[in-house]
Amino acid sequence: MPQAIHISPIDNVVVALHPIAKGTLVEVDGLSVTALEDIPQGHKMAVKPIRNGENVIKYGFPIGHATADAEPGTWMHTHNVHTNLSGEVEYSYNPAPDLAPLPKVAPEIFMGFRRKDGRAAIRNEIWIIPTVGCVNDIAKKMVADNQDLVTGSIEGLYTFTHPFGCSQTGHDQAQTRKLLAALVRHPNAAAVLVLHLGCENLQHDQFVEELGEYDHDRVKFLTCQDVDDEFAAARSILKELAAYAGQFQREPIPVSELVVGMKCGGSDGLSGITANPTIGRFSDMLGQRGGSTVLTEVPEMFGAEGFLMDRCINHDVFVKAEKMINGFKEYFISHNEVVYDNPSPGNKQGGITTLEDKSCGCVQKGGTAPIMDVIGYGDPVVTKGLNMLYGPGNDLVSATAMTAAGAHLILFSTGRGTPFSAPAPTLKISTNTPLAEKKSGWIDYNTGVIADGEKTIDETAQGLLDLVIRVASGEQTKAEKHGFREISIFKDGVVL
């Protein structure tokens, strides 16, 4: 079993794949270094002398600079490494020399649902979407009271509550309206009840305009203040929606029609070595089969955005990526926040030292394929292949944004563990085996076997593709079995 990994030949640190005790001789890539102190799993150890102010190199990239001299065998972490990041950067387009679509592969088949507009779906559910937080509990009671309608091919009746839709103005309200309308359009929702209170800022006419053309049999509206008994009214509407949703049956669909979101959270020092490269390889494999993937968490690209921007398929896509990256930095600066204050306490405990360290691991989820498009918050994926999406690092906000973009399911890597799920089925992928064993009720797939020396990234990626096909065909994720699913909306404005 390997003790550590030297990710790039030019790195001046290695990453401990397992805890390394002080005095242990570590041999990797022809290097022999004795640990001068205990090195926790996922943390970095110097393998070359690093002087005060010199860059610490991991993934072949500077992840910060040393704040004190360090000899080989020294633990390199927050006590002796600091970020190099500052504010906005002027980027230039330097396309990678090998920038080209990956060779195509015949797509496998999954058993999904074909909607009347031609789109594919992997779930056949009825959703209740409240437009304002005032009706949240009403929506929950409607779900509880109408579970008898979940029969035949209908796989669930759910609501996605939130505190917004009123006391918002301008761009902030428009962003909420856009996100909710995008959820209404999601193909996994066979039928949707949009639930209004009546007096909220987010008015019915505004929402219908935002929604655009829609199937009147698939989407129904109810304004609670307009009826004597909203529960009786909802019962009648939900019966109609159930009759509509029940006509869909699973049928063979090529995986080329899948849209898969990619996210990491509760990351550790192994995220960029095991789980995220596995997801990246999966992304390449799905792209080769004609499918689409979505990468977001813009603040967790800071410091590693060059890896992605040089892979933009053309200059127009590069310009959109540049605007997205610097636009998000300006969002931070406008709120008097530094752009590099990101790694959480859990990230640091797991071995992530700086935002560059976190970002270099995060972008591994993007694989090697060209970036085909950059889309805004609440916008749909319209281009096959790898897409970048405007969204924050926050787990639930970004997972909701990927769902709104049309992701059928989400791959979520974690080194610390998290139970949540977006409205789209959310597969939890552990970076290390101890987490998979400890939280077996949360984790769907373990890539810690890479660190254990049992499997290669190619093997775990193939296993992940097989699992995605099974989940797309109806196999439930751990979170689905627990009934976990929720949304969170990206708010950026005052509260009236």
Q: Where are the language model's segments positioned?
A:
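Metallocofactor- and cofactor-centric catalytic cores in central/energy metabolism, strongly enriched
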Residues: 1-409, 416-419, 424-496
